[in-house]
């Protein structure tokens, strides 16, 4: 299983189609998260618990992927469900050393 700590397990940077995205934590953010496709930045509200922070990251990651695919209209129910499945995968994956 994935490591279980108290600190959220989210990327600080990642690449999609050759573009580097940055993840930042913001003290005063009205929403739980925000995906800015022009700045290639995901902002996450600071101070949330571990699970909310991770779920928000995966939700915003789905937005980032869709923007990268050229999709500008995102159905929130799809984004939320797909992000939750990615988070579940990440939290329950089992790795084996080769």
Where are these regions (language model features)?
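Active-site recognition of the HExxH zinc-binding catalytic motif
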Residues: 55-67
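Active-site scaffold of zinc-dependent metalloenzymes
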Residues: 3-52, 67-90
């Amino acid at each position: 299983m994935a490591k279980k700590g108290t600190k959220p397990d989210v990327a600080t940077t990642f690449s999609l189609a050759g573009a580097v995205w940055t993840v930042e934590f913001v003290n005063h953010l009205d929403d739980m998260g925000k995906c800015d496709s022009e700045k290639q930045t995901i902002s996450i509200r600071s101070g949330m618990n571990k699970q909310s922070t991770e779920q928000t990251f995966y939700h915003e990651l789905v937005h980032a992927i869709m923007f990268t695919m050229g999709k500008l209209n995102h159905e929130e129910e799809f984004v939320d469900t797909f992000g939750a499945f990615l988070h579940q995968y990440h939290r329950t994956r089992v790795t084996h050393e080769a």
